[in-house]
Each structure stands twice: as structure tokens, then as C-alpha cells.
């Protein structure tokens, strides 16, 4: 059984899948005891993307840090392992954006709860995830989503810079596979990079 908690600040309700129970909740407000216990928590919620975090640093940091703290507090109370979505953005500089810092802070919180309280936490970093339901337009759109949207609308593909920027692009199915492989391992703050290990330039894409 899968239960999803989401406030839909960046997600879409039309992306709902069969076999999953959806609860509209803002995890910054914490969890209540009426919530049933779980075998594992995948903490994937965050205000993502670099540019929006630069425009709204306080909102991004408070949202991402406080929500992670609430998840860890609840998990520690119920002794539920947590698998946390860290960020590959810190590799571009920890202080390069409020988003990168907030996700790094979340990683450190996971390590803290493992070290001090013995909570099982696993940190997984994603690399440019794409798939059927990625966002195609707006502030939170990914580069693959933007290209796809422009292609479908018979528009020229927009390249910023010389197009030689190289990235590791990872399909969502591979991300899910990596996350599932971490279940039941009883890790204590270990970090895993989930990617293909092969990079492509924006021109290649």
C-alpha cells in the first residue's frame, strides 16, 4: 500500500496513479497521530529549482528545512526508516543557491538523526530526472520538459549559452528502481548518487 502526502504547490492532481491513496497536506505543519504507521518514508517533497530559490530564499530554506525536520521527527517517534531526496545541485557549489543549501541542510539533518537517535536514513541524489509527467512549462520546468513542449508546439528549441553544458539525465523509472533498492537496508546517513554515469551536452539532447 502506498500513501502520498502532497500540497500540490508544484505537482498536479491529474498525475495521480491507481493503487495509491492521496492526502492533501502541508508537511511543514507536522504530522498528527491519526496518520497510520508505515514501513518506510520516501521524503521527496521540496520547493525545487535554483532560480525560484534565488528569488525567494527565505521561503525556500524554511520550507525545505522545516518540512524535512518534521518528517524526521515523526519518523523517529514511530521508528520508521527515511529515504531522503538530496540534491546534486550542491556539486555546483554549496552556496550557489538557497535551494542547494536547503537540500544540503536536509542531508545533514538525516545524518544527525542517524548519529544521535539511531534512525535509519538514506540520502539519494538525483540527476536531471525526466519522464512522462515532468513539468513542461513555467518556473519549475526541466530542460527536457521545455524542449518537449517546444517540439510539440512546433517552436524552435531554446538553448541558453553555447549548448556545451553537460549533464547526466536520468529516467524516472531508474530513480524509482534506485529508491526501492534502498528499502530495508538500515543505512545510517549513507549517500547514493542515482544517475546513469553518462553525461550529454544540451546540444546532444
PLM features per residue range, with description:
Residues 18-19, 87, 139, 143, ...:
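Activation loop
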Residues 104, 129-145, 153-156, 160, ...:
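Glycine/proline-rich active-site loop of Rossmann-fold NAD(P)-dependent oxidoreductases
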Residues 55, 59, 96, 134-135, ...:
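Short capping/connector residues at structural and topological boundaries
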Residues 123, 169, 199:
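Short aromatic/basic micro-patch
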Residues 113, 147, 151:
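Short amphipathic helix/loop within the catalytic HATPase_c
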Residues 34, 94, 136-139, 143, ...:
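Residues at alpha-helix caps and immediate loop-helix transition turns in enzyme cores, especially N-
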Residues 1-129, 173, 179, 203:
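N-terminal Rossmann-like NAD(P)+-binding domain of SDR-like oxidoreductases, especially those catalyzing
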Amino acid at each position: 500500500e502506498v500513501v502520498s502526502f502532497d500540497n500540490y504547490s508544484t505537482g498536479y492532481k491529474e498525475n495521480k496513479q491507481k493503487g495509491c491513496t492521496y492526502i492533501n497536506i502541508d508537511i511543514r505543519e507536522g504530522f498528527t497521530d491519526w496518520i497510520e504507521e508505515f514501513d518506510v518514508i520516501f521524503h521527496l517533497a521540496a520547493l525545487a529549482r535554483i532560480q525560484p530559490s534565488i528569488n525567494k530564499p527565505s521561503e525556500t530554506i524554511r520550507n525545505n528545512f522545516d518540512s524535512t525536520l518534521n518528517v524526521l521527527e515523526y519518523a523517529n517517534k514511530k521508528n520508521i526508516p527515511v529515504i531522503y531526496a538530496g540534491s546534486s545541485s550542491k556539486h555546483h557549489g554549496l552556496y550557489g543557491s538557497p535551494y542547494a543549501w536547503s537540500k544540503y541542510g536536509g542531508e545533514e539533518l538525516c545524518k544527525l538523526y542517524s548519529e544521535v537517535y539511531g534512525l535509519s536514513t538514506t540520502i539519494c541524489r538525483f540527476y536531471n530526472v525526466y519522464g512522462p509527467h515532468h513539468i513542461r512549462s513555467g518556473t519549475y520546468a526541466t530542460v527536457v520538459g521545455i524542449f518537449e513542449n517546444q517540439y510539440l508546439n512546433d517552436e524552435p528549441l531554446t538553448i541558453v549559452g553555447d549548448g556545451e553544458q553537460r549533464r547526466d539525465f536520468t529516467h524516472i523509472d531508474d530513480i524509482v528502481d534506485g529508491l526501492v533498492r534502498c528499502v530495508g537496508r538500515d543505512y545510517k546517513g549513507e549517500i547514493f548518487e542515482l544517475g546513469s554515469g553518462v553525461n550529454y551536452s544540451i546540444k546532444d539532447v
